[in-house]
Amino acid sequence: MQLISAKIDGQTCMPTIKNGLLTVEVPNAPFIWEAEVEISPETNTALEGLYMSGGMYCTQCEAEGFRKITFYPDRPDVMACFTVRIESKLPVLLSNGNPSAQGEGWVEWHDPWPKPAYLFALVAGNLVNHADRFTTQSGNNVDLNIWVRPGDEDKCSFGMEALKASMRWDEEEYHREYDLEIFNIVAVDDFNMGAMENKGLNIFNSSCVLASPETSTDSNFERIEAIIAHEYFHNWTGNRITCRDWFQLCLKEGLTVFRDSQFTADRRSASVKRINDVINLRGRQFREDN
């Protein structure tokens, strides 16, 4: 990442950069920080920050990937409302929150809810969507989209039904309604996490959201349902209510895993789910006991 220019309250400043850390003198009062940087997503092979996957731009910012996009105090306790403008010739341009304005070759997204930088997301590419709509208990209509590469549209139906079931279950069991006008899922082949709960724009490894009866097993379907539920449940346990620091990671993840386990138990067999959870704990959490 290369710093092109920096300003504080509109005045050019000269920060020092050492070992990737930027230091600059700041006023003793609130101020506006502006930075213009240059990055190279095409050569970003770490798959962290903003990178390119098969002609599509996408992001992965948990835990500290946002600092590879721009200079920012990307700690989970630093929360802000984001407005993002994307300019590109690519047909689909997505980010967090709700679309607020658009024109030829550009779109703006605004997320009204303060969030830490690890939940920032951006996707740009040649994608097609499987669309649906969900009506919350209070009567708000939410547009739902699963974005995929052309040719994968026929593998989205199960994932969409799992998403709607997760939204309804969270309303009925925890009284938590979705809080934006749109919810997007993007399937990415080269994604180094199973899935990521970015606010309003979940990014999934394709294997965790796409399925068809011809090529997927029963366990594939159950896994996809559980992962979609887990990432959606993070909207409240992790996104709106986040952790103070990364030593508290177990709080947001532990609570959300508990919630997705409850969801699977309600949707399928509670006894079988409990047995599988114990097998998983013994095999992964307590390997020394095997």
Predicted regions and their residues:
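Hydrophobic alpha-helical and helix-loop surface patches within well-folded domains
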Residues: 3, 9-11, 18-20, 109, ...
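Acidic/His-enriched low-complexity segments
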Residues: 1-182, 207
